[in-house]
């Protein structure tokens, strides 16, 4: 193992501990299993293809944060995460928080676009090497299309399983426009993520130029 491998490995081990801790006694085991289909597929793929496609530490950090947020939602079910109580405990009051619907799932849909976008950008840049506007447009379209696919999978799972499990997994909380709002938030998160990636690329380019100039001067 090289020095560069230590950080991704540390994130993997920490996530493994979080996964086990939140998976020991989830509120609804069947919903936890459904919610974690994403993790059961994505994590082995990331580990298997680590050598052939290594993301930046920045992208791995974003993936780690998203997966932790997802595990919290899977532990409680997204519609029952006690986020209001947590914020109230930290800030001492919760009267400024929106009433009614539990918005944790909306927050994670936004986080999905924001935190997965860096890895999607690096994947597309490494495998397809798009140029010009397409270098930035393709990752955004990638995230938006996968958000649509996820909503379709949610709907199909709710149809197949039905009952309380289907309702818990779908998590609409009575909002007929829930899927559309989730997709819109994921798109907004991805757009913000794209802006952050562009800023990071510009900063890295400027830093590389400065190092080159310093080396040339020396």
Q: Where are each of the predicted segments found?
A:
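Alpha-helical transmembrane segments of multi-pass membrane proteins
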Residues: 22, 63-73, 118, 142-154, ...
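Short, hydrophobic transmembrane alpha-helix segments
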Residues: 21-33, 44-54
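Interfacial segments of alpha-helical transmembrane regions
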Residues: 44-68, 121-125, 129-146
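N-terminal membrane topogenic signal
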Residues: 1-13
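Membrane-interface loop-to-helix entry segments
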Residues: 31-38, 99-120, 176-188
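Interfacial helix-loop-helix junctions of multi-pass membrane proteins
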Residues: 29-32, 104, 147-187
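Extracytosolic (periplasmic/ER-lumenal) interhelical loops and adjacent juxtamembrane/interface segments
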Residues: 75-107, 156, 160-174
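Membrane-interfacial alpha-helical segments at the cytosolic side of multi-pass membrane proteins
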Residues: 41-50, 111-128, 159-163, 184-200
């Amino acid at each position: 193992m090289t020095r560069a491998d230590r950080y991704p490995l540390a994130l993997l081990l920490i996530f493994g501990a979080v996964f086990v801790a939140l998976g020991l006694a989830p509120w609804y085991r069947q919903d936890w299993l459904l919610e974690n289909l994403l993790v059961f597929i994505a994590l082995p793929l990331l580990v298997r293809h680590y050598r052939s496609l290594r993301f930046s530490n920045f992208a791995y950090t974003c993936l780690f944060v998203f997966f932790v947020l997802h595990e919290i939602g899977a532990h409680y079910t997204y519609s029952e995460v006690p986020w209001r109580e947590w914020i109230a405990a930290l800030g001492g009051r919760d009267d400024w928080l929106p009433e009614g619907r539990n918005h944790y799932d909306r927050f994670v849909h936004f986080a999905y676009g924001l935190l997965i976008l860096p890895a999607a950008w690096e994947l597309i840049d490494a495998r397809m090497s798009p140029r010009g506007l397409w270098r930035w447009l393709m990752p955004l379209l990638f995230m938006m299309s996968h958000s649509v696919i996820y909503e379709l999978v949610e709907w199909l799972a709710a149809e197949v399983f039905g009952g309380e499990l289907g309702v818990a997994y779908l998590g609409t909380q009575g909002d007929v426009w829930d899927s559309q709002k989730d997709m819109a938030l994921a798109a907004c998160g991805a757009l913000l993520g794209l802006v952050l990636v562009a800023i990071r690329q510009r900063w890295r380019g400027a830093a590389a130029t400065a190092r080159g100039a310093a080396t040339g001067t020396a």
